[in-house]
Amino acid sequence: MQDLSLETRLAELESRLAFQEITIEELNVTVTAHEMEMAKLRDHLRLLTEKLKASQPSNIASQAEETPPPHY
């Protein structure tokens, strides 16, 4: 009776381990895909930011364009 219980418990543990290994592999694939997508989105955001900066003139005048401050 004791041997059957040990065999049953061992089979259950092996089954759980196999399920966990499959789950870990699936999660690894998902995380890798998300990392790749985030890298693409970061690149896209950087390009859009550069385009936006290039298309909008700055409201701050350069130092050469500024009028000199009054002297006291």
UniProtKB/Swiss-Prot annotation:
It comes from the Bacteria. Residues 55-65 have a biased composition (Polar residues). InterPro entries: SlyX. Residues 52-72 are annotated as: Disordered. It holds the Pfam family SlyX. Belongs to the SlyX family. This is Protein SlyX. It comes from Escherichia coli O139:H28 (strain E24377A / ETEC).
